[in-house]
């Protein structure tokens, strides 16, 4: 074989073999090189449990994951969520260390018949650090917490389940303990009792973000709402349950029936 042919073969082989491209080659297409609206449309379908890992990929992706627009888009997805909170009464321990929040995650089981299984998944929620107990009620995607524990409080705290963040709302006109009864009627939150004196009722409107007082129940029927073990809203009324008695608050009549 002549030297010229050897040289030709050597040159041709060097042209056919290309060095491997490195991962950080700027010429490579990347997910974040797509328009933001396309990236956000993809991210809204990714479970929140993966967001922390996504934030570590790049600054651009971290910015999109933490953007209010992604939170807004997630609220448009058709889904139902159940939030559960467990607490322990431990003296001199901040509430955020003893409150544990969970949501239900549905998992499809691979069986002959299509079945589902649910499990509790822990979610990080920054509970207000100076409170230890609340009455709570949900309206839409937000959970509202009112009243204190043994010490009466007038504060209102709101948990946005879409973002997992707490914010403080306007305070009630009357400070209340956790013995207050809370119910939701027609999208408004009714807080009944929990005061040291006579029963007083306040109504919070999430749309106007304001409180207003209603006519107090008649004194002779207030006993049905003085203390309660639980409360529930049904048929435009708030029912409170205690040992041996059920109290009924009807906002249309602004009064209480006891039986």
From Swiss-Prot:
Stored SMART domains: FBOX, Kelch
One Pfam family linked to the record: Kelch_FKB95
Swiss-Prot/TrEMBL Kelch repeat ranges: 142-186
Region (Disordered): 1-29
UniProt keywords, alphabetically: Kelch repeat
Ranges for domain F-box: 28-76
Composition bias, Basic residues: 1-12
Nucleus is among the record's keywords: no
Record protein name field: F-box/kelch-repeat protein At2g22050
Organism: Arabidopsis thaliana (Mouse-ear cress)
């Amino acid at each position: 074989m002549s030297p010229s042919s050897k040289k030709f073969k050597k040159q041709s082989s060097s042209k056919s073999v290309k060095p491997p491209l490195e991962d950080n080659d700027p010429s490579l297409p990347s997910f974040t090189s797509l328009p933001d609206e396309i990236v956000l449309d993809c991210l809204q379908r990714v479970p929140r449990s993966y967001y922390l890992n996504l934030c570590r990929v790049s600054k651009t992706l971290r910015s999109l994951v933490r953007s209010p627009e992604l939170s807004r888009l997630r609220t448009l997805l058709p889904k139902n969520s159940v939030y559960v909170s467990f607490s322990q009464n431990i003296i001199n321990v901040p509430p955020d260390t003893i409150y544990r929040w969970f949501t239900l995650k549905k998992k499809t089981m691979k069986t002959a018949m299509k079945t589902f299984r649910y499990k509790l998944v822990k979610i990080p929620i920054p509970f207000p650090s100076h409170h230890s107990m609340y009455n709570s009620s949900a309206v839409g995607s937000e959970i509202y917490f009112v009243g204190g524990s043994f010490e009466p409080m007038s504060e209102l705290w709101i948990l946005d389940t879409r973002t997992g963040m707490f914010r403080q709302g306007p305070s009630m006109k009357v400070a209340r303990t956790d013995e207050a009864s809370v119910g939701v009627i027609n999208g408004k939150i009714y807080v009944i009792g929990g005061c040291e004196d006579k029963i007083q009722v306040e109504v919070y409107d999430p749309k106007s973000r304001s409180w207003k007082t209603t006519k107090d129940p008649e004194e002779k029927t207030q006993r049905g709402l003085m203390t309660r073990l639980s409360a529930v809203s049904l048929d435009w009324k708030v029912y409170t349950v205690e040992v041996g008695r059920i109290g009924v608050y009807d906002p249309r009549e602004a009064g209480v029936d006891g039986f």
